[in-house]
Amino acid sequence: MERIICLVIGYVCGLFQTGYIIGKVHKTDIRDYGSGNAGTTNAFRTFGKKAGAITLLGDCLKCVLAIVIVRMVYGNSMNGILPLLTLYAALGCILGHNFPISMEFRGGKGIAASVGMIIAFDWQIFIVCAVAFFALFFTTHYVSLCSLSAYAVAFILVLVFGHMGKYGMDQAHTVELYIVMAVLTAMAFYRHRANIVRLFHGTENKVFLSSKNKK
């Protein structure tokens, strides 16, 4: 039951679509432009760096909020499996972001919300993923490649830290934690399936922080 409640809490938080709201401020639907989703990269490309930064922050914070709420609700009674419950909240939030019922299930791809998840779940993993992301970004400028690579790193580190006993759970719950993280990782790759095809074909769009670097 606790898992379902965490999923619902996360899903409700995930329904707050920062990019979509910014689009409405500009009197347009962000999903009608660029990649057709309501995420950070599309906001950056469609409305500029400021809008992209606001979208990143908003989508990141909603996942942090979902995890904070779950920790407040279950921090005392379910402390033994709290890391697992926080991942269920994150899963719900990313599902709400990617497939919002309020927007006919047309949301984003979940990367910014996943940043919030990693920050709130394990800051050490966040630091490693951030280094991996930016090292690859300044080399390739492919946001999709960087995001998926960072996700893969996060998944591997969860496996490593879980095996080391960092999360303080028994084996059954630790394996369940791995499964939830695997679902999150698989969903990220699925949502980026078109990007993956373009990467293989060499047609994926690059993102530059400065117009001076564009070719």
PLM regions: where:
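Cytosolic, membrane-interface loops and tails of multi-pass inner-membrane proteins
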Residues: 20-51, 107, 197-215
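C-terminal ends of transmembrane helices
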Residues: 19-24, 96-106, 132-141, 193-197
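Alpha-helical transmembrane segments in multi-pass membrane proteins
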Residues: 2, 6, 10, 15, ...
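C-terminal membrane-associated helical module and adjoining short loops/tails
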Residues: 168-171, 175-215
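Short, non-helical or kinked segments that cap or interrupt transmembrane helices
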Residues: 29-40, 102-115, 142-151
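Interfacial segments of multi-pass membrane proteins
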Residues: 44-49, 70-74, 110-140, 153-162
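Helix-coil boundary and interhelical linker segments in multi-pass alpha-helical membrane proteins
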Residues: 1-5, 67-87, 119-126, 160-179
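Canonical bilayer-spanning transmembrane alpha-helix
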Residues: 135-165, 169-170, 174-175, 187
